[in-house]
Amino acid sequence: MENKSKLIVLSILFTPNNILYYATQLNGNIIFWTSSGVHKQKNTKKVTLISITTVINYIKYKSVNYKGIHIRTKGFSKNKKLVIKQLKQSTLNILSISDKISWPHNGCKKRKIRRI
């Protein structure tokens, strides 16, 4: 199957314990996905600099045949700037970067904090 547009959308979902990466075509069909846990990183090691660079190297390897990449990020993490910086330093042709943050406007009540 030949991709005519040669553009992909890289969606990055930041969760508290992991970072998920989805590469899709412009119409939404998933090309590949990966995460830090797929690359043999476990527990708190999944959000370190070493695991981020290994995943970005994998993304570079998989997206060689594409002309450009649109990046969409979602979620909260202290490593968001680090991931975007690593992607900018790579040889990928980044066309746009968008960030979707959903702040609650005093919505649902927070969970009760667990006491040990």
UniProtKB/Swiss-Prot annotation:
Keyword Mitochondrion found: yes
GO cellular component, as recorded: mitochondrion; ribonucleoprotein complex; ribosome
Gene3D superfamilies in the cross-refs: Ribosomal protein S11
Subcellular localization, as worded in the UniProt entry: Mitochondrion
Gene of this entry: RPS11
GO MF annotation list: structural constituent of ribosome
Organism: Chondrus crispus
Protein name in UniProt: Small ribosomal subunit protein uS11m
Record-linked SUPFAM superfamilies: Translational machinery components
